[in-house]
Amino acid sequence: MAKVQVNNVVVLDNPSPFYNPFQFEITFECIEDLSEDLEWKIIYVGSAESEEYDQVLDSVLVGPVPAGRHMFVFQADAPNAGLIPDADAVGVTVVLITCTYRGQEFIRVGYYVNNEYTETELRENPPVKPDFSKLQRNILASNPRVTRFHINWEDNTEKLEDAESSNPNLQSLLSTDALPSASKGWSTSENSLNVMLESHMDCM
């Protein structure tokens, strides 16, 4: 059983100009004390064509975390516009929130993001070179995709090592290489949940 449940994610300051920071209010619950930190990341998918354009906007360690309910606001700077292909600057992309424990990702929350010009003239005649200062970012907060992964939560790693040697498939299940990429990981996963709410996500 997972020792951490993400109860709620609220998208703050949305919509907002492209260069404004991303802000998410995250509420999670631990069923028991965690001896090590949780690592949270915000990842911006620069292009659906290749994960090489994914940008980790910020990473924060939270912990050690006592049992109970906790809430924090996770803020990250906007992506580096110079690393985004011109063809992918305007339109729909994805932002991901991930959390790992002992280097193992156990949850991923993905949101569609629509970047568009607010001025009619720019929408009808967009410049060849994108003007990011004129773009507005709108996160589809009402329709997150939530993907969960089974990990080893125990302090005793010997137990997992024994299981790996007796079951060679277990290592591949827990390997980060086996996890879906940020660009493609939650689009068709049968473990994904569509959660429909007006302004926030409530994990089931």
From Swiss-Prot:
GO biological process, one term: osteoblast differentiation
Keyword terms, alphabetized: Chaperone, Chromatin regulator, Chromosome, DNA damage, Nucleus, Phosphoprotein, Transcription, Transcription regulation
Phenotypic effect of disruption: Embryonic lethality at mid-gestation (9.5 dpc).
GO molecular function terms listed in the Swiss-Prot or TrEMBL record: chromatin binding; histone binding; histone chaperone activity
Cell location: Nucleus; Chromosome
Modified residues (Phosphoserine): S192
InterPro entries listed in its UniProt record: ASF1-like, ASF1-like_sf
Annotated stretches, region: Required for interaction with HIRA: 155-204
Family under the similarity heading: Belongs to the ASF1 family.
Protein's name in the database: Histone chaperone ASF1A
Role noted for this protein: Histone chaperone that facilitates histone deposition and histone exchange and removal during nucleosome assembly and disassembly. Cooperates with chromatin assembly factor 1 (CAF-1) to promote replication-dependent chromatin assembly and with HIRA to promote replication-independent chromatin assembly. Promotes homologous recombination-mediated repair of double-strand breaks (DSBs) at stalled or collapsed replication forks: acts by mediating histone replacement at DSBs, leading to recruitment of the MMS22L-TONSL complex and subsequent loading of RAD51.
Domain of life: Eukaryota
Source organism: Mus musculus (Mouse)
GO-annotated cellular components: chromatin; nucleoplasm; protein-containing complex; site of double-strand break
Database matches in Pfam families: ASF1_hist_chap
The keyword Nucleus is assigned to this record: yes
Post-translational modification summary for this protein: Phosphorylated by TLK1 and TLK2. Highly phosphorylated in S-phase and at lower levels in M-phase. TLK2-mediated phosphorylation at Ser-192 prevents proteasome-dependent degradation. Phosphorylation at Ser-192 by PRKDC in response to DNA damage promotes the histone chaperone activity and ability to replace histones at double-strand breaks (DSBs) at stalled or collapsed replication forks, leading to RAD51 recruitment.
